[in-house]
Curated annotation (Swiss-Prot):
One of its GO terms (molecular function) is ATPase activator activity. Keywords: Chaperone. InterPro entries: DnaJ_domain (IPR001623), HscB (IPR004640), HscB_C_sf (IPR036386), HscB_oligo_C (IPR009073), J_dom_sf (IPR036869). GO terms for biological process: [2Fe-2S] cluster assembly; protein complex oligomerization; protein folding. NCBIfam families: hscB, PRK05014.1. Residues 2-74 form the J domain. This is Co-chaperone protein HscB. It comes from Shigella sonnei (strain Ss046). Co-chaperone involved in the maturation of iron-sulfur cluster-containing proteins. Seems to help targeting proteins to be folded toward HscA. The gene is hscB. CDD domains: DnaJ.
Amino acid sequence: MDYFTFFGLPARYQLDTQALSLRFQDLQRQYHPDKFASGSQAEQLAAVQQSATINQAWQTLRHPLMRAEYLLSLHGFDLASEQHTVRDTAFLMEQLELREELDEIEQAKDEARLESFIKRVKKMFDTRHQLMVEQLDNEAWDAAADTVRKLRFLDKLRSSAEQLEEKLLDF
């Protein structure tokens, strides 16, 4: 059973996050291992496994990029283990330039430039994210998979920039 079905939700990218949260809480209560403490060893093990599945499904569906990757996996795209890389050379060059810029910002310890950089990367991410949403809605799986690969780069870059921001603030 896929995670969407497990949570009683349609298998699509855009979902009702409130319904997801409520269903998660219901499933947690229903299958919490403590409820099976007096049960047989097999029942206890099954409860622990079910609880782990609930938590994994919850983590996957609540995180937008993970949810997109999971939805694509249901359509034959195993992005988590695939060896496909982004073949868009212009995008890759842009990523290299952005990484170099982030390194320069770190060397200069330039907080104002870093703030501007983070905003720019967030805007780039948001633009591509919206494109991905449209591609998934239109079931353009190949295009969506390519966009998700690019979003991974941007997500890592954003994370690196935010870590640098914390480092500079602690300095």
